[in-house]
Amino acid sequence: MAYKEELAALGEISFEKIRRVAYNYVISLPEEDRNALFDSLNHGVNLLDSDAQMKLYMYSFGKMHQAKVYRALQSLDLNVFTQNDFDVVDWGCGQGLATVCFFDYLKTRHITNRAGNIILIEPSDSARERAEIHVKAYVEPHTNVRCVGKYIDDVTEEEIKSESPVTIHFFSNILDINSIDLKRLAEKLGASVQGQQYIICIGPMNSGNR
């Protein structure tokens, strides 16, 4: 069964159900294969380019990722998302987990998902395609989901331009990568700002990031 069909069989989508698909796959693997696959993730740092890697990442790191996104969102005044349409820009999105968890979080607060445009930035073709599948399962058919197959430094101002009154940006486990030019990134964000902009930065849980 194709992955898209696996998700469709879940009924109403949620992060927990997405992870359940990954869980069922991973526990069916022989331990030796599972360990070799885990080593290929390099603690979640390597680009994901296979269905098996993406499912193991979801199985291994998904719940921790969800907890960090929820914790970050607790600092936001969610009223802004009840009163306005909004855009989402997910930088280095991987499988789109930050956006998925954000949509789930809105649902737990009984807030209608009013996303108009979603921009998924990710250099891995496989992960980006998986992110698009995940995100489209949450939104109405008229919602514009745009994929940008680039590294962060290569993204242009035009590609992240938003015309909605509210835009939320997610940087999840990405800004600690030394190769990213943070000054250049800040300049791009500043040049594209329109309306209210919320920037959610989530990093590894280690003492150096406190």
Per-region residue spans from a language model:
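Class I SAM-dependent methyltransferase Rossmann-like catalytic core
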Residues: 45-79
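Conserved SAM-binding loop of SAM-dependent methyltransferases across substrates and taxa
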Residues: 95-111
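A short SAM/SAH-binding and catalytic strip from SAM-dependent methyltransferases
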Residues: 165-181
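S-adenosyl-L-methionine
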Residues: 129-162
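Conserved SAM/SAH-binding beta-strand->alpha-helix loop
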Residues: 124
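A short glycine-rich, Lys/Arg-flanked "PGG" loop and its adjoining helix->strand segment in the class I
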Residues: 183-195
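N-terminal auxiliary segments of SAM/dcSAM-dependent transferases
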Residues: 1-40
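Conserved beta-strand signature within the Rossmann-like core of class I S-adenosyl-L-methionine
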Residues: 195-206
